């Protein structure tokens, strides 16, 4: 959410930003909120003047009563009563205007960083860098569910009977591999100085609207019936929410947390072969990282965060690349974002496995996350990044570590979490 003072002083910058994000339908909102803001300030000035006059008249009434000027006092009493009624009317209007302003301001997108490429959607994202050499083996790589089934490692049919499409039972070595990746990612981030945390898996609506747009909320979140609670779609929401309505000191910054949680999402995406299996599902687990920091440090942390994900994947022998998200692919609160994509030898292309975002002070403004500085208070900056989401990680891991005999090699870093095993073997049927 933008600072209303910034919008008031820089309407053309805000409008150009909206155009850069290809959201021209929101352009009229800028002028609308400026008019509402003007009316809001007029109301406050009128109320202030009326209260001052009311207070002055009240003192005069007391003096008149003492001097037995009862008729004059009655005239002033009537005037005070009229002022009180007008103040009440204006207070009602003020509340309505402020609600309208807040609603519009929650819709206007955050100002993107000047370095963000201008583009309409994810097809115009820009490749930044590749890490590791993509390899296509001289044998056929099966679809990921077929690889899992060879280890008796997934049961989609039973999950469909129990919960419907978009769920799975992971079994045996595949389930163990899933847990191994999560445990390794946890320790990886702890070793990089992050504090480990398991957050609430449900959050209230004021936290939801503090961390994302209404459109994102509607597309992602499951609401608990009869409760002001939503199942989290990612633990970053719960983790950022931890700081709601808090004032931190500069000495307490940065806050660097890594969190584990199950995640629940309504979204399914477009149908197609890559939508089968575990690529896009309703329930999955994830290791996340968030940072709350000073504004001047947020871009430095942004670089550190996505590099953590790259380093994690490379430690498991998985080639990756980074993509700079273009303006039209950025969610409304984001200032800058980079996707990390893993190499798929089966598809002979990269696919998304994580995303790192700098949200500037947008979430902090919505949630009231302030910092007490030497020269006054200011809003913190917040960032988030996927450490690893095992469903997609498993796809990349299995494809890149599959051997010609059907076994899967376990990289050295994962072996302590897999009982020391160097590979997992195909199960005999």
Report the location of each language-model feature.
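N-terminal alpha-helical targeting/anchoring segments
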Residues: 1-134, 149, 153
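TRNA-recognition modules of translation machinery and tRNA-sensing kinases, especially anticodon-binding
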Residues: 27, 130-429
């Amino acid at each position: 959410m933008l600072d209303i003072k910034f919008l008031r002083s820089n309407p053309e910058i805000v409008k150009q930003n909206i155009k850069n994000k290809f959201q021209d339908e929101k352009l009229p909102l800028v002028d609308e909120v400026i008019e509402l803001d003007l009316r809001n300030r007029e109301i406050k000035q009128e109320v202030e003047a009326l209260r001052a006059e009311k207070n002055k008249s009240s003192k005069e009434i007391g003096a008149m009563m003492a001097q037995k000027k009862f008729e004059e006092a009655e005239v002033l009493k009537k005037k005070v009563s009229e002022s009180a009624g007008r103040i009440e009317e204006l207070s009602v209007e003020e509340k309505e205007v402020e609600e309208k302003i807040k609603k519009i301001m929650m819709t206007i997108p955050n100002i993107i960083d000047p370095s963000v490429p201008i583009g309409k959607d994810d097809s115009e994202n820009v490749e930044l860098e590749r890490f590791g050499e993509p390899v296509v083996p001289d044998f056929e790589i099966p679809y990921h569910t077929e690889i899992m089934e060879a280890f008796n490692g997934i049961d989609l049919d039973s999950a469909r009977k129990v919960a419907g499409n978009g769920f799975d039972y992971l079994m045996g070595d595949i389930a163990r591999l899933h847990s191994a990746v999560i445990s390794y990612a946890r320790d990886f981030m702890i070793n990089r100085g992050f504090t480990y945390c398991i957050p609430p898996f449900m959050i209230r609506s004021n936290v939801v609207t503090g961390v994302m747009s209404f459109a994102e909320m509607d597309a992602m979140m499951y609401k608990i019936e009869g409760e002001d609670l939503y199942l989290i779609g990612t633990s970053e929401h719960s983790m950022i929410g931890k700081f709601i309505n808090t004032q931190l000191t500069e000495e307490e910054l940065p806050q660097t947390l890594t969190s584990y949680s199950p995640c629940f999402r309504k979204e399914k995406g477009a149908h197609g072969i890559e939508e089968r299996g575990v690529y896009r599902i309703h329930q999955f687990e994830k290791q996340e990282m968030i940072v709350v920091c000073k504004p001047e440090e947020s871009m430095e942390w942004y670089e550190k965060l996505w590099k953590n994900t790259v380093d994690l994947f490379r430690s498991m022998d998985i080639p990756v690349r980074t993509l700079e998200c273009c303006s039209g692919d950025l969610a409304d609160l984001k200032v800058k974002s980079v996707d990390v994509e893993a190499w798929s030898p089966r598809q002979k292309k990269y696919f998304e496995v994580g995303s790192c975002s700098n949200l500037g002070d947008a979430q902090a403004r919505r949630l009231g996350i302030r910092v007490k500085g030497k020269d006054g208070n200011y809003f913190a900056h917040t960032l988030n990044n996927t450490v690893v989401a095992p469903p997609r990680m498993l796809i990349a891991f299995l494809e890149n570590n599959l051997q010609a005999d059907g076994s899967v090699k376990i990289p050295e870093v994962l072996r302590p979490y897999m009982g020391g095993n160097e590979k997992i073997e195909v199960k005999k049927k």
